[in-house]
Amino acid sequence: MWQLWASLCCLLVLANARSRPSFHPLSDELVNYVNKRNTTWQAGHNFYNVDMSYLKRLCGTFLGGPKPPQRVMFTEDLKLPASFDAREQWPQCPTIKEIRDQGSCGSCWAFGAVEAISDRICIHTNAHVSVEVSAEDLLTCCGSMCGDGCNGGYPAEAWNFWTRKGLVSGGLYESHVGCRPYSIPPCEHHVNGSRPPCTGEGDTPKCSKICEPGYSPTYKQDKHYGYNSYSVSNSEKDIMAEIYKNGPVEGAFSVYSDFLLYKSGVYQHVTGEMMGGHAIRILGWGVENGTPYWLVANSWNTDWGDNGFFKILRGQDHCGIESEVVAGIPRTDQYWEKI
């Protein structure tokens, strides 16, 4: 009897596998399949002529890693709006609107952290301090505690590094903004563009505790520190309250190949292979055509998605988006003379 049962189970598994369509991650067929499903989002081409190794390396977050203690939230009496956009709530903080580019490096774990940290420094100093915190400094100097540099890392450890060691300033590639701007160039997602090709190769840059020529103060003097770091529970309301009170947070989720094709709407996984874990910055929420969403900033340049941003289903821990949220509070005492 058990042999018959085992045979039936095998047949069901095979039938289910065959019923799932299989597409190349960047194919017209996958775009058409998603769009014909009449789901809550629209697919289109964001990448052309790029290596699969590059696409998988974009997803450089190790999910399920160590987490700092949760911060106790008191949200019972907090009245949260139906929609919220940190760009509109704190318009005097320019980094909230910014989209960065991680290039050919699995550094999303570092970008999600420094983007949210930059936003929070501005928010918690009432816009008296506006700084682009350096992804380069975090990526190169956190070492094995944070993971493996361009080969992936842990978002929670990025925030811990900020509180323990501090992070210097640093803008985009060749921006010459701050102490340590990003040293990895953006790569070309399109066929006839001017940027270098996207590959899945490249070593993590070396940690340098010297600011670029012409910048002052010194590396040590330029450090920005966190007062604390913590994880946020996977409660939808707790995450909303954290963003509402303190600013954008870092989150992470499982990326499937259909996500690479996101153009607009509220993303929900339809089909496609698992690419890896990916860290991002969550800056708000809302409802679109009856579908609740998180508003999220990616780090794949402004020519990806909706000018670099995307929306993803909210309230159902879709692809794990609500399970890996981390944040922290800046040490504002270091800015007293500016405030």
UniProtKB/Swiss-Prot annotation:
<dbReference type="GO" id="GO:0042470">
    <property type="term" value="C:melanosome"/>
</dbReference>
<dbReference type="GO" id="GO:1904813">
    <property type="term" value="C:ficolin-1-rich granule lumen"/>
</dbReference>
<dbReference type="GO" id="GO:0046697">
    <property type="term" value="P:decidualization"/>
</dbReference>
<comment type="similarity">
    <text>Belongs to the peptidase C1 family.</text>
</comment>
<keyword id="KW-1003">Cell membrane</keyword>
<feature type="active site">
    <location>
        <position position="108"/>
    </location>
</feature>
<keyword id="KW-0788">Thiol protease</keyword>
<dbReference type="InterPro" id="IPR000169">
    <property type="entry name" value="Pept_cys_AS"/>
</dbReference>
<feature type="disulfide bond">
    <location>
        <begin position="105"/>
        <end position="150"/>
    </location>
</feature>
<keyword id="KW-0964">Secreted</keyword>
<feature type="propeptide">
    <location>
        <begin position="334"/>
        <end position="339"/>
    </location>
</feature>
<dbReference type="GO" id="GO:0005764">
    <property type="term" value="C:lysosome"/>
</dbReference>
<protein>
    <recommendedName>
        <fullName>Cathepsin B</fullName>
        <ecNumber>3.4.22.1</ecNumber>
    </recommendedName>
</protein>
<dbReference type="GO" id="GO:0030574">
    <property type="term" value="P:collagen catabolic process"/>
</dbReference>
<dbReference type="InterPro" id="IPR013128">
    <property type="entry name" value="Peptidase_C1A"/>
</dbReference>
<dbReference type="GO" id="GO:0070062">
    <property type="term" value="C:extracellular exosome"/>
</dbReference>
<dbReference type="InterPro" id="IPR038765">
    <property type="entry name" value="Papain-like_cys_pep_sf"/>
</dbReference>
<dbReference type="GO" id="GO:0048471">
    <property type="term" value="C:perinuclear region of cytoplasm"/>
</dbReference>
<keyword id="KW-0007">Acetylation</keyword>
<comment type="subunit">
    <text>Dimer of a heavy chain and a light chain cross-linked by a disulfide bond. Interacts with SRPX2. Directly interacts with SHKBP1.</text>
</comment>
<keyword id="KW-0378">Hydrolase</keyword>
<keyword id="KW-0325">Glycoprotein</keyword>
<dbReference type="GO" id="GO:0009897">
    <property type="term" value="C:external side of plasma membrane"/>
</dbReference>
<keyword id="KW-0865">Zymogen</keyword>
<dbReference type="Pfam" id="PF08127">
    <property type="entry name" value="Propeptide_C1"/>
</dbReference>
<dbReference type="GO" id="GO:0097067">
    <property type="term" value="P:cellular response to thyroid hormone stimulus"/>
</dbReference>
<dbReference type="GO" id="GO:0042981">
    <property type="term" value="P:regulation of apoptotic process"/>
</dbReference>
<feature type="disulfide bond">
    <location>
        <begin position="142"/>
        <end position="146"/>
    </location>
</feature>
<dbReference type="GO" id="GO:0006508">
    <property type="term" value="P:proteolysis"/>
</dbReference>
<dbReference type="GO" id="GO:0062023">
    <property type="term" value="C:collagen-containing extracellular matrix"/>
</dbReference>
<dbReference type="GO" id="GO:0008233">
    <property type="term" value="F:peptidase activity"/>
</dbReference>
<dbReference type="Pfam" id="PF00112">
    <property type="entry name" value="Peptidase_C1"/>
</dbReference>
<feature type="disulfide bond">
    <location>
        <begin position="93"/>
        <end position="122"/>
    </location>
</feature>
<feature type="disulfide bond">
    <location>
        <begin position="187"/>
        <end position="198"/>
    </location>
</feature>
<feature type="modified residue" description="N6-acetyllysine">
    <location>
        <position position="220"/>
    </location>
</feature>
<feature type="disulfide bond">
    <location>
        <begin position="141"/>
        <end position="207"/>
    </location>
</feature>
<keyword id="KW-0472">Membrane</keyword>
<dbReference type="GO" id="GO:1904090">
    <property type="term" value="C:peptidase inhibitor complex"/>
</dbReference>
<keyword id="KW-0458">Lysosome</keyword>
<dbReference type="GO" id="GO:0046718">
    <property type="term" value="P:symbiont entry into host cell"/>
</dbReference>
<feature type="signal peptide">
    <location>
        <begin position="1"/>
        <end position="17"/>
    </location>
</feature>
<dbReference type="GO" id="GO:0005576">
    <property type="term" value="C:extracellular region"/>
</dbReference>
